[in-house]
Every structure is written in C-alpha cells, then in structure tokens.
C-alpha cells in the first residue's frame, strides 16, 4: 500500500470522469484551491441557497451532458440562484 495524495486522487478521477465539487460558502474558508484544481467545475453555493442544492446538482448534470448553461439558468424558477452557483463558469 502506498499513500496517495488528495491531488493525485483527483487527477486519477479526472482521467475517467467529469469531476465537480460544490462548496457551501459560509465565510472564513479559503476555497481558491478548489478553483485552482477544478476551475469551472468548482461550484460555490452561498449558504442562503443551500435549499437549492439538488437543483444545482441537476443543472450541473444537464450542462455536463451538453445543455447550454444560459438556457438552463434561464429556465430555472430562480435564475439568480444558478447564476451565483455557476459564477466561475460565467466569467
């Protein structure tokens, strides 16, 4: 058995899968490492939007499967929630 670093595990997973991570923003945590390693696949969900987590995951799956991000956002009942969650991808 050889220990594997978290970053090495992430890289291995990225060879086979589209890897996403949703961070719930509560303040005080440095999330830049997730941005660095996942880029647009790091979703930041403000704590006030946590009740929308399932919808954010569903929207992520739709976009990963080819749906247009702007259409997915526009068709959601509260587009501002998805705009906040996908702000890395919308820059």
Show the residue positions of the predicted features.
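Acidic, glycine-rich A-domain
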Residues: 1-91
């Amino acid at each position: 058995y050889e220990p594997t670093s978290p970053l090495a595990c992430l890289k291995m997973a990225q060879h086979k899968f589209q890897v996403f991570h949703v961070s719930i923003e509560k303040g005080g945590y440095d999330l830049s490492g997730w941005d660095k390693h996942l880029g647009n696949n790091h979703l930041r969900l403000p704590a006030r939007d946590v009740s929308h987590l399932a919808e954010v995951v569903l929207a992520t799956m739709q976009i990963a499967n080819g749906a247009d991000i702007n259409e997915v956002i526009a068709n959601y009942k509260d587009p501002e929630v998805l705009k906040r969650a996908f702000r890395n991808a919308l820059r």
